[in-house]
Design a protein with these regions (language model features):
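Short active-site neighborhood of thiol/selenol oxidoreductases, capturing the structured segment around
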Residues: 306-324
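Thioredoxin-like thiol-disulfide oxidoreductase module
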Residues: 297-301, 331-412, 417-430
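Hydrophobic, well-ordered secondary-structure elements that form the walls
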Residues: 143, 177, 315, 320, ...
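Long cytosolic C-terminal regulatory regions of eukaryotic multi-pass membrane proteins
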Residues: 351, 438-440
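Cys/His/Pro-rich metal-binding microdomains
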Residues: 113, 321-324, 399
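Hydrophobic alpha-helical segments characteristic of multipass inner/organellar membrane proteins
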Residues: 1-300, 307, 349
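Detector for the c-type heme attachment site
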Residues: 324-327, 403
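Amphipathic alpha-helical segments in well-structured domains
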Residues: 165, 169-172, 201-204, 329-333, ...
Length: 441
């Protein structure tokens, strides 16, 4: 008898662990197609993430998700899917049955997880990590979902001690709705930057975020409620805490709307708002930190040759978050700023610029693999230039070189201040003896 109970308990433990494992596996597998796409054409995810109309689509999707969180409607997959899987799991049994139960959970919980997964997908496509970040995010999400279900399968008595869902769950969903609104603005901003519409300048973007989080503060303090909420919620510790954090965040944002706000460049948010030079206020330069930069390779090389200075070649993007982080958090370091400003010619090539090339400058490019690509925009030209000459499609990507193409240091990507500074010094110390020499004492 004891042996029988032990065997049943052991089987229950195994099934619970398998259940949790399959939940994680299902969400991880959802990212697999994006790795296949990326392996076929390594530039495809960057092309997708910076596509103007796709970013507008993501903007609309995030608005749709936000209003779902606000309770105006609920996102659900057809119940027939869940019912069929549930029937199949009961009929099949064993490992396959447990997998089908996990798949049933993924479908049934879609009304809560769908908007979050959509946000994760869109956010990952917009990052330089692409499919890898998506896989990590989906796996992490699956793990977070599987952990409590696995624990409850192991220890059913824990369910009795859980607080009942209700007010706190609704508050959390509404807060996520406001966050979705803020992220929606980010995708609209990507489209605006790439297309050069000039609609969402930096201060307008920050102003919209301020309005969104002020709205969230008002909701948390109970100044208004959404139609699906029957009664005014209780102002508990959780609501007060979230409201205070949101208020501090709004206070942090406000200086970013003012002219000459370099004293508060919102470094914690670097990469999310548009670049500082994309402003409603008059700027001395259309380059980061008011550098003198050149956005055409040939022109920049000619200038470097005429002034006898080495080149800092900057492969960047209008919608590149890590590019903004380097510009605002690394280049702003006084020592790095001085070296770039005084000792180098900065050439910034935007690989996601959708401005069409002049008809006579458009051409067809054939890769060594035999793949043929029509180069019709400025961004396509610089993306192909980077891929062919430097075997990379990631941004930011920095090259130190002489005007004749001599490389002064290995390429550098997204990194911290000490590493970037040392890289600059190493590159400048390798300038040929017949050219300029530098000292860093």
């Amino acid at each position: 008898m004891l042996h029988g109970k032990s065997s049943i308990k052991s089987e229950g433990l195994t099934n619970a662990l398998l259940y949790a494992f399959f939940i994680v596996l299902i969400y991880a597998l959802l990212s697999t197609p994006f790795h296949l796409i990326d392996s076929i054409n390594p530039e495809i995810l960057n092309t997708i993430s910076t596509n103007i109309w796709l970013n507008i689509f993501f903007f609309l999707i995030f608005l749709f998700f936000a209003f779902s969180f606000f309770g105006y409607y609920e996102l659900t997959l057809p119940w027939s899917w869940a019912n069929r899987l549930d029937f199949a799991s009961n009929k099949t049994g064993g490992i396959i049955g447990i997998f089908l139960i996990a798949l049933t959970l993924a479908i049934v919980s879609f009304s809560c997880t769908g908007p979050i997964l959509g946000s994760l997908l869109a956010g990952s496509l917009s990052s330089t990590e692409g499919a890898t970040q998506l896989s990590m995010g989906m796996t992490g999400f699956g793990l977070a979902l599987a952990l409590p279900f696995g624990l409850f399968a192991l220890f059913p008595n824990l369910l009795k001690n859980l607080p009942k869902s209700g007010g706190w769950m609704n508050t959390l969903k509404v807060v996520l709705g406001f966050v979705e609104l803020a992220l929606a603005i980010k995708f609209l901003s990507n489209a605006d930057l790439v297309a050069h519409w000039g609609i969402l300048k930096r201060e307008v973007f920050i102003g919209l975020w301020i309005l969104i989080f002020v709205g969230m503060i008002a909701y948390l303090f109970g100044l208004f409620r959404f139609p699906h909420e029957a009664k005014k919620p209780t102002l508990g510790i959780g609501r007060i805490f979230l409201a205070v954090v949101s208020l501090l965040f709004v206070m942090y944002l406000v200086p970013g709307t003012l002219p000459n706000s370099s004293s508060n460049s919102l470094k914690l948010l670097a990469g999310f708002p548009p670049p500082t030079f994309y402003s409603i206020y008059t700027q001395d330069s259309d380059c980061p930190l008011n550098f003198d930069c050149y956005k055409d390779y040939d022109k920049g090389v000619a200038i470097a040759k005429s002034v006898n200075k080495p080149i800092l070649l900057d492969f960047t993007g209008w919608a590149c978050v890590n590019c903004r982080k380097v510009e605002e958090n690394v280049w702003s370091d006084p020592e790095i700023y001085k070296l770039i400003n005084e000792e180098l010619v900065l050439i910034s090539l935007y690989v996601d610029d959708r401005e069409p090339l002049a008809k006579e400058d458009q051409f067809t490019l054939e890769y060594t693999s035999g793949r043929i690509r029509n180069i019709e925009t400025i961004g396509q030209k610089w993306a192909a230039f980077q891929a062919i000459n430097f075997n990379s499609v990631a941004q930011p990507h920095y090259i130190m070189m002489m005007h004749d193409g001599t490389l002064l240091a290995p390429p550098q990507q997204y990194t911290d201040i000490p590493t970037y500074l040392q890289w600059l010094k190493n590159g400048l110390s390798n300038v040929p003896s017949h050219s300029i020499r530098f000292k860093f004492e």
